[in-house]
């Protein structure tokens, strides 16, 4: 049994304050709840370092949070395939798709085959491609990415995320 008794800030980037502090709590809560202790996923810890640097050093770190959430979901195997839809067809920018946590992304016309209580989100193929490529430069892609990552994370953590509740 390992116990942390004391921690000191060793620097390297500014200590998080204000909203950055809550973002840091959120990031660490996701890591704690979605990964097993001492998981050997070095690229995930690289993503954690990158997002913490962004959160501590940038005024607007929304894109960094979305990028980290997507990296976390992808590396843990909880992200849907954004290269192909449920029919094996390539995701096309001009199409609209239905995304749910439980199923593959499908063209919106096929969404009716799912139980109406099955929560999901309609999203353009262009946004899916931007999410897949980590392109969060457009405000619309940031907003849609938030809906997508929140849907997927909430499905994995039905008990909720405490740090998110503090910010609301």
Protein language model regions, located:
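Non-catalytic alpha-helical scaffolds and adjoining flexible linkers that form interface surfaces
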Residues: 1-168
